[in-house]
């Protein structure tokens, strides 16, 4: 089982409690766990604190959520890149890429969602990009079988 959670930064304390109780269960926090460029440092730190748990993964997605509704179609999301960089610095390769389809069509194209990570996140190593773009999810699913 993979626990998939579409929560907010405020839910991280509860998520960490679940991670403590069930360390064998991978927890995947969708849409960067609801991070937004307008979040307080406290909320951002609360999400980053969850990186201390080996069973908590962060879904590398939600570009339009991270920027906010008024900045949709802002590819390649330069104004939000610092949040993705900070998340990578904390979670490392324990991230999983997501397209946000079909919601992505309201803020970018599928290709742009993919290229944001592949091309514009030069702070992520090639090896970790492979993990984030598919190997991690493959490994998580194979642990279930």
Q: Where on the chain are the PLM-derived regions?
A:
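Catalytic pocket-lining loop regions of alpha/beta-barrel enzymes
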Residues: 1-96
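Mid-to-C-terminal alpha-helical segments outside catalytic/metal-binding sites
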Residues: 58, 85-96, 105-145
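Short, active-site-adjacent cap segments at secondary-structure transitions
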Residues: 65, 104-105
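Active-site glycine-centered loops adjacent to acidic/histidine catalytic or metal-binding residues
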Residues: 100
